[in-house]
Amino acid sequence: MHILADENIPLVDEFFAGLGEIRRMPGRRINRAALEGVDVLLVRSVTRVDRELLQGTAVRFVGTCTIGTDHLDLDYFEQSGIDWASAPGCNARGVVDYVLGCLLALAEVRGEALARRRFGVVGAGEVGGRLVEVLRGLGWDVRVCDPPRQTREAGGFVTLDEVIAECDVISLHTPLSMSGDCPTFHLFDRQRLSGLRPGAWLINASRGAVVDNAALRDLLLQRPDLEAVLDVWEGEPQVDVELADLCRIATPHIAGYSLDGKLRGTAQIHAAYCAARGLEPTVELAQLMPGPALAGLTFAASAEPAEMLATLCRAVYDPRRDDADFRRSLQGDDAQRRAAFDLLRKAYPARREIDGLAVRIEGDNPALTAVVSALGARLLR
């Protein structure tokens, strides 16, 4: 069996070497010619996998080590009998850590207490749902908009218009869909963006085209009271440089790039492939996951909950380095910037997740215990 994998997918050898011959190449360069003789294709979101790519090839399994599937032509897979798998939830914790880091950075710049703001989460699937749990666990006021879930579950949801009208912070976590009952392409269009509350913060760590980038650029030029955090961009790896300059935090689609999430994605695809072929997995992620570099953190019982929150979040992620690296990359011509975007992602340093932290509190303080519990860190007793 022959396997072609995006070169940026980790642990491919460890999980798939016993199943066939592995070849790697950059995801954006995968084309029909590269698939000659290939049975299994392993990709990320940068590779569009559709009829044009696959027709006439021997590929019978496609695995994407990502949550989203908007780059896969699932209808064609079904028509052609091609098995496929994604990695739902693999990087959810990493994205939550990213959002928390950005919230802390914004609060510091604006001199505002996060506990006093009202949060709106648009899209409450694997990522957004986890974020809602964390924010509510911290005791913060959260509104949730998720029309597909609202049709299946009773209560607890609000409309998008209510989120825009009522929330000071809006974080987007929807898939990208162009049609259907709940299309999300330009979900935040010019009209909806114009309705943002004074001083609102908008965070997009979902898909670039969920927000009309040109409309957001125009709005930020007119509304200096607003703050924008963008990790995803329309037309990636091409980026609107003027829009990036106007964002408080701008990063190159790395919100979910925790080491844990990347390895989890490969493990999930391996498990899905084995299930589809009736094989017993011979490798477990726990055998390959490295231990955290930070062994643990200890707090006195007198510590302030807000300071503890900031310390724990920044122990795993602070967006300011990624923001600075990204801004330095926005030089040169379009081709140079596109190459720099991909290079930042390819060479991204190892980042761990909050739930890998071990925390000790010297004494009894229920407020501190609540912070640890909300974040999902491990409390040592």
Swiss-Prot record:
Q: What is its EC number?
A: 1.1.1.290
Tell me the function of this protein: Catalyzes the oxidation of erythronate-4-phosphate to 3-hydroxy-2-oxo-4-phosphonooxybutanoate.
Where would you say this protein principally sits, based on its record? Answer: cytoplasm
Subcellular localization is given as:
Cytoplasm
Organism, by scientific name, is Stutzerimonas stutzeri (strain A1501) (Pseudomonas stutzeri)
Query: Which NCBIfam families does the UniProt entry name for this protein?
Result: PRK00257.1 (NF001309)
Q: Which residues bind substrate?
A: S45, T66, Y257
Keyword Methyltransferase among record annotations: no
Q: Does the keyword RNA-binding apply?
A: no
Q: Which UniProt keywords apply?
A: Cytoplasm, NAD, Oxidoreductase, Pyridoxine biosynthesis
Q: Where is the active site?
A: R207, E236, H253 (proton donor)
Q: What pathway is this protein a component of?
A: Cofactor biosynthesis; pyridoxine 5'-phosphate biosynthesis; pyridoxine 5'-phosphate from D-erythrose 4-phosphate: step 2/5
PANTHER family cross-referenced by the UniProt entry: FORMATE DEHYDROGENASE 1 (PTHR42938:SF9)
- For this chain's UniProt record, which GO biological process terms are given? 'de novo' pyridoxal 5'-phosphate biosynthetic process; pyridoxine biosynthetic process
Q: What protein does this entry describe?
A: Erythronate-4-phosphate dehydrogenase
Q: What's any one GO cellular component for it?
A: cytosol
The record's catalysed reaction(s) read:
4-phospho-D-erythronate + NAD(+) = (R)-3-hydroxy-2-oxo-4-phosphooxybutanoate + NADH + H(+)
Q: Which GO terms describe its molecular function?
A: 4-phosphoerythronate dehydrogenase activity; NAD binding; protein dimerization activity
- Which InterPro entries does the protein's record reference? D-isomer_2_OHA_DH_cat_dom (IPR006139), D-isomer_DH_CS (IPR029753), D-isomer_DH_NAD-bd (IPR006140), Erythronate-4-P_DHase (IPR020921), Erythronate-4-P_DHase_dimer (IPR024531), NAD(P)-bd_dom_sf (IPR036291), PdxB_dimer_sf (IPR038251)
Q: What class of enzyme is it?
A: oxidoreductase
Family membership, please give it: Belongs to the D-isomer specific 2-hydroxyacid dehydrogenase family. PdxB subfamily.
